[in-house]
């Protein structure tokens, strides 16, 4: 079943070339989709248009049968409860504890007063504890977020998205600032979330080999337009060159391509 559909979506910033130009694609429930491309290719703009953190300049976006691009404030807030977001730079409140940051994922379901006072019921707290345990950071729940590592912060961000009970999670360069070991941990967790929970993931990445290893599907962007959309097995060296505008093929890419091909 189609969960997300974009039709002719564009985004123009004043005084610049279009960040997105006539972008159209659909995503099925349970898909793991990686969006690759060079810096400035439109990956982050795409993700932020999907949940309307920024407003598209044109086109239509529908999610779960609802036309997101036409929603007003209350309707958009409701839809956003089902679209989690994981940020490159975590977007946590550093002075608050891990568990407090995770429970912020429930704010979309709360009244303004309950949100300000931090009122959460026992079911919400139990769910947060269970997710932290799955992500291997339950022992950090009472630590302030300025006292934990970058990889641990990213797991907090994932936990915050999961307590929303989302149908889809958007991940904006979630491993860009992490070392290889931490990157693998994060990607493994994201893959398990997709396969075990059936949550759709759309993740922007620079690393071609990571996209090849983890994705059901890859979408390649260059200057705001789609230059590739298909399974990892079809992503050829020529396509990589087309997407990035320069030779990007390495031994790790060739090894990953062989793995993706089975």
Where are these regions (language model features)?
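Conserved catalytic motifs of ABC-family nucleotide-binding domains
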Residues: 165
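Catalytic Walker B motif of ABC-type/P-loop ATPase nucleotide-binding domains
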Residues: 169-172
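The feature captures the beta-strand-to-loop junction immediately N-terminal to the Walker
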Residues: 36-38
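Helix-to-loop junction immediately C-terminal to a conserved catalytic motif
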Residues: 51
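Helix N-cap at the start of a conserved alpha-helix in ABC-type nucleotide-binding domains
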Residues: 180-182
């Amino acid at each position: 079943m189609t969960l997300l559909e974009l039709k002719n979506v564009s985004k123009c910033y004043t005084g610049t070339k279009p960040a997105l130009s006539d972008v159209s694609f659909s995503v099925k429930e349970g898909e793991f989709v990686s969006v690759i491309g060079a810096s400035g290719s439109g990956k982050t703009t795409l993700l932020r248009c999907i949940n309307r953190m920024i407003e598209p300049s044109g086109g239509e976006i529908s999610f779960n049968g609802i036309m997101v691009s036409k929603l007003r404030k209350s309707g958009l807030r409701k839809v956003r409860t089902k679209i989690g977001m994981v940020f490159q730079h975590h977007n946590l409140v550093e002075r608050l504890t891990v568990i407090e940051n995770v429970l912020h994922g429930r704010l979309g379901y709360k009244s303004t007063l309950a949100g300000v006072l931090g009122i959460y019921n026992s079911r919400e707290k139990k769910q947060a504890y269970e997710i932290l345990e799955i992500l291997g950071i339950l022992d950090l729940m009472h630590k302030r977020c300025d006292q934990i590592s970058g990889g641990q912060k990213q797991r907090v961000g994932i936990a915050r998205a999961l307590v929303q009970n989302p149908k889809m999670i958007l991940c904006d360069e979630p491993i860009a600032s992490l070392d290889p070991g931490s990157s693998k941990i994060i990607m493994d967790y994201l893959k398990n979330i997709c396969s075990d929970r059936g949550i759709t993931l759309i993740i922007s990445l620079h690393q071609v080999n990571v996209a090849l290893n983890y994705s059901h599907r890859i979408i390649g962007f260059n200057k705001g337009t789609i230059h590739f959309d298909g399974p990892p097995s079809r992503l050829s060296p020529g396509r990589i060159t087309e997407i990035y505008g320069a030779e990007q093929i390495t031994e790790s890419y060739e090894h990953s391509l062989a793995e993706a091909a089975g």
